[in-house]
Amino acid sequence: MTLRNKTQKFTAKMVGPALVGALVLANVCAPRALAQGGHAHAATADQTPPTQEQLNQANALVKIVKDATARFQNVKQAIAEGYALQFGCVSGDGSGAMGLHYVNGALVGSGIIDATRPQIVIYEAQPDGSLKLTGADFLVFANAWSVNHSDPPQLMGQLFHLFDAPNRFGLPAFYTLHVWAWKDNPNGAFVNWHPNVSCASYGAQNQ
């Protein structure tokens, strides 16, 4: 079965049970939104240089996500735990790509953010047909979040960004935060697009 044949209807899986486990929500330092092409910012980005505390917190978040997703280096493990490919391979015009989003429908829709349980794990298709884990994506629907919160979500100092509706994914408005924990992004660990991620191999395998 090709990767494209594994793609399923995403919106039917959006409502799942509440997440369990410890939450790692940021309330230590002020929100800092890094430049993220392709998303509407949830708030105006702070252009001042980050403090050492903010840098430490950002590095800590990357480590937490990397440790929490290490087992998903084998995509079969992600599939076994309920993640499934959605949207095909997401690429941008001149800004690189996001890659392949494997979404856990049971973790989406609760309005809860847990740094150790990302709603999405991200892969890049390789020329040999394998998939390489590149990072994770945290996603919460705007309407679910707004029930109990007046401010946009943030995770350990990183402000989520808003995708308004309608959008290319056909979803209601949602907040999202990418964490490139497994493939260094020269534009920053939390930007949406990765200039060194490509959909070329995915496209070649699914022609």
Please give the residue ranges for each predicted region.
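N-terminal secretory signal peptides that target proteins for export/translocation
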Residues: 1-12
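Bacterial N-terminal signal peptides
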Residues: 16-27
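Cleavable N-terminal signal peptides
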Residues: 21-23, 33, 40
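Sec/Tat signal peptide C-region and signal peptidase I cleavage site
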Residues: 29-35
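Primary mode marks residue(s) on the alpha4-beta5-alpha5 output face of response regulator receiver
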Residues: 36-207
